[in-house]
């Protein structure tokens, strides 16, 4: 049986950043890069150090008597740091003028989730509004709505379909189909966790309180830049799409405290900078990076 409680546990189990409190540190290995500015070859060199610190806080502040409607508030903070070396550039000033660059990203969101039935099957609706920015100011308001229909739920298999609609003029794909498939193999400790378009993982319990995963995940990153040197002046946004392949180990220190360790190879699909609010197809700067090793450490707290 699917209830709001079981649905919520499924989400927090798969995505640590949706738990009450989560903190993660990610270190990316050194890599070579080359870039274009305003369509022209611009700069090449080496990223010696690239790391991220992320903190997430989520708190349900209203639950209806029927337990079918929940309002949740969320706060996000990210610190991202780059260190460059061996740079070869032309005379134009680009988005990363210094050898070391630091960025701060903040976001706050309100999310409404409602569970009902469609064709006698559970369906979960969600609407989320987000305000984000950097240390300079609030920069944008955006949001999305989604619907997820549970097609099948048994002891070994869960299948859902749905759609996500972005309320964001800069979105390249305003409507995204959603599909999830989780299946525990018969007479096996392994299960498959597939979420379109985000991940494909093969998982198994390990030791008494651990879980091991092997697979690939698609992640996106963004932050804002306040640029003051021509040809780029004003507020811009960096968007990066990454494909991470490797292994994950999760450990339950207690029923409420969970640890995370990930290691593998990070492939940057693209890194683009646009004017704030513009679609990423209208980028003014892009750069390519070679594949790099990475690791991530995290710890989260979830009392529910």
Predicted regions and their residues:
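Solvent-exposed loop/turn segments connecting transmembrane beta-strands
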Residues: 102, 133-142, 165-175, 189-200, ...
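Repeated loop/turn-to-beta-strand initiation elements of outer-membrane beta-barrel proteins
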Residues: 64-69, 117-124, 156-161, 188-191, ...
